[in-house]
Regions:
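Short loop/turn motifs that initiate or flank beta-strands
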Residues: 1-221
Length: 221
């Protein structure tokens, strides 16, 4: 109610309804950079701006139903968009505030670190040059193996020289791992010997049997 008075005039009273609009509260989302972990999960923090100081202890931001995920899991130099699913809300809001949902933030995924690359069970038959082995690496995450498709480009090869093996990684590039400065581990090649057996035969002029040691199946292991 507004009352206007002046001695020269008759008192006048005017009534006016004033509508109070809810105060806008904006939410800012910040995604945290992470090291490659093979997952889409993103860590996101939220802050609310616009809540009056006198209400700050009562009206609080609730983000329990909001989750962030990267658009893809791979490492890269550029920031990636983090998609927010779910909505923020205000605890103890009696209608005095209206909440604006946050925009999708961005963050970077850096490469994980491979600490060693090695081969196990490196062996071959004594009469061949072809090696059999199992490659592995320490530092791989989320159950990934050196044999996981798309883990790297190029060819990792194991080569032998004088009974020793070395791992050649020339031209190999890992999509999500850094192995700069890591020297692949070499070692001794296990040589599988032939299994001898006795093959008997008759010699001319000798009715008895003579023996000759050869590999089983005619030099086959």
């Amino acid at each position: 109610t507004i009352t206007a008075t002046k001695v020269e005039y008759v008192t006048a009273i005017a009534k006016q309804t004033i509508k109070v609009e809810p105060k806008l509260v904006t939410v800012k989302a910040v995604a945290k950079d992470k090291v490659y972990d093979g997952k889409l999960d993103a860590e996101v923090s939220f802050t609310a701006e616009g809540i009056l100081e006198k209400d700050a202890s009562l009206v609080t931001l609730n983000t329990t139903s909001v989750a962030g995920t990267f658009t893809d899991k791979n490492a890269g130099e550029s920031a990636k968009t983090v998609i927010l699913k779910g909505e923020c809300s205000l605890n103890n809001n009696t209608g005095n505030y209206v909440l604006a949902q946050p925009a999708n933030p961005t963050a970077k995924i850096s490469k994980a670190k491979i600490t060693s690359i090695f081969a196990s069970n490196v062996k071959r038959s004594y009469k061949t040059t072809s090696l059999s082995y199992k490659l592995d690496a320490e530092g791989l995450v989320n159950g990934e193996l050196i044999t996981t498709p798309g883990l790297y480009t190029g060819t990792i090869s194991v080569k032998e020289a004088s009974g020793k093996y070395s791992i050649d990684m020339t031209g190999v590039t890992f999509r999500n791992y850094d192995y700069a400065g890591v020297q692949p581990i070499g070692g001794d090649v296990t040589i599988i010997k032939g299994i001898p057996t006795i093959v008997t035969y008759n010699t001319e002029g000798n009715a008895g049997a003579a023996g000759m040691v050869v590999d089983n199946g005619g030099w086959e292991n």
